Amino acid sequence: MAKNIKDIANQYAKAIFELAGEQDNVDEVLTDLRTIKTVLDENQNFITIASSADVAIASRDDLLKTLTGNSTDSVKNLVKLLQVNNRLNILSIVVDEFVSQYNEVNGIVDVQATTAVALDDGRLDKLASVFASKTGAQQVNIENVVDESILGGVILQSQSTLIDGSLQTKIAKMKAQLLG
């Protein structure tokens, strides 16, 4: 049975996470991978060029050495392994999977707070505290997204939890009760 790309990326991420744990440099590997992801996000054609058969092998190797720069040996080896296996196209997904594993192990949760108006940092910090107390998260990284269609209130959403306190949902529930 063929595996999907996310499963394959997860295997690479799990392997480098375990290796980093054994070498006691998980935080350093995380920093290196995030730096690489930033470079890839800012240079959309990087992987295409670094994988192209039209580009000389030495030039592709130089590109990858530039990408990994001062990274740990395990990160350099990961990128080289992906290149050898013709899987450079999943490097960003591998980074995302590594970050997910790191966050899970460290009790870190990424939360999207959807509100009708932008919130200041103080209110976002309070929402993060509420979310942490309700879910048991050690740390909450909160991002505010403005969506005027929710009318008011807030929707807090992580990968596994949804807390919908939006005015739009409350109105819809009242309407259903009145009509039901």
UniProtKB/Swiss-Prot annotation:
GO function term, MF aspect, one: proton-transporting ATP synthase activity, rotational mechanism
Membrane topology, as annotated: Peripheral membrane protein
Localization annotation: Cell membrane
Assigned keywords, A-Z: ATP synthesis, Cell membrane, CF(1), Hydrogen ion transport, Ion transport, Membrane, Transport
GO CC terms of this entry: plasma membrane; proton-transporting ATP synthase complex
Main location (coarse class): membrane
Pfam name, any one: OSCP
Family: Belongs to the ATPase delta chain family.
Assembly, per entry: F-type ATPases have 2 components, F(1) - the catalytic core - and F(0) - the membrane proton channel. F(1) has five subunits: alpha(3), beta(3), gamma(1), delta(1), epsilon(1). F(0) has three main subunits: a(1), b(2) and c(10-14). The alpha and beta chains form an alternating ring which encloses part of the gamma chain. F(1) is attached to F(0) by a central stalk formed by the gamma and epsilon chains, while a peripheral stalk is formed by the delta and b chains.
UniProt cross-references to HAMAP family, sorted A to Z: ATP_synth_delta_bact
Function noted in UniProt: F(1)F(0) ATP synthase produces ATP from ADP in the presence of a proton or sodium gradient. F-type ATPases consist of two structural domains, F(1) containing the extramembraneous catalytic core and F(0) containing the membrane proton channel, linked together by a central stalk and a peripheral stalk. During catalysis, ATP synthesis in the catalytic domain of F(1) is coupled via a rotary mechanism of the central stalk subunits to proton translocation. This protein is part of the stalk that links CF(0) to CF(1). It either transmits conformational changes from CF(0) to CF(1) or is implicated in proton conduction.
UniProt protein name: ATP synthase subunit delta
Originating organism: Leuconostoc mesenteroides subsp. mesenteroides (strain ATCC 8293 / DSM 20343 / BCRC 11652 / CCM 1803 / JCM 6124 / NCDO 523 / NBRC 100496 / NCIMB 8023 / NCTC 12954 / NRRL B-1118 / 37Y)
Gene expressing this chain: atpH
